[in-house]
Regions:
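Short beta-strand/loop element within the Bergerat-fold HATPase_c
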Residues: 49-61
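Conserved glycine-rich
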Residues: 114-115
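Glycine-rich ATP-lid/hinge loop adjacent to the conserved G-boxes
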Residues: 87-97
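Acidic ATP/Mg2+-coordinating residue in the GHKL
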Residues: 69
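Short conserved segment of the HATPase_c
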Residues: 74-87
């Protein structure tokens, strides 16, 4: 979170964390990039009183990390396409500056790291992005 602190402060986003004591074995640099994409979207599509909550929990030998915001959300009919290359949803088109590459690259990178990246959203209420880390023998702190 430290590397994305300026963006979050500048955007007025309050960050809450819960149970981030889980350990994963992964490439920290690329996971930081991946989280950056998710946090940038949360900051860009924020509500008037933006809050982003990061939480982690063990699921058997796997670890689930959730990044949830209370932003403007994604229309249900657009949700299946948000990871498509070049796709910019109606919210991105109306705000400008969107390339449609952020979530595409995030999904590709997650796959390369054997991390499952999923999205759930409700328009007007917010978005939840979930990273499911694979089970590994050698663990380091998240």
């Amino acid at each position: 979170l430290q590397s994305h602190r300026a963006l979050l402060i500048q955007s007025g986003v309050r960050v809450e964390t819960r149970d981030l004591d889980q350990r994963v074995y992964t490439d920290g640099k690329w996971v930081c990039f991946l989280l950056g994409q998710l946090l940038q979207n949360a900051a860009r599509y924020r509500s008037a009183q933006p809050v982003v909550t990061l939480s982690a929990r063990a699921l058997g030998r796997r670890v689930e990390l959730t990044v949830e915001d209370n932003g403007i959300g994604i229309p249900a009919h657009e949700l299946p396409r948000i990871f498509d290359r070049g796709f910019t949803g109606s919210n991105g088109r109306s705000r400008g500056g969107s390339t449609g590459m952020g979530l595409y690259l995030a999904r590709r990178l997650a796959a390369a790291l054997e991390i499952e990246l999923r999205a759930a959203s409700e328009e007007g209420k917010g978005t939840r992005m979930t990273l499911l880390f694979p089970a590994r023998e050698n663990l380091s702190k998240l």
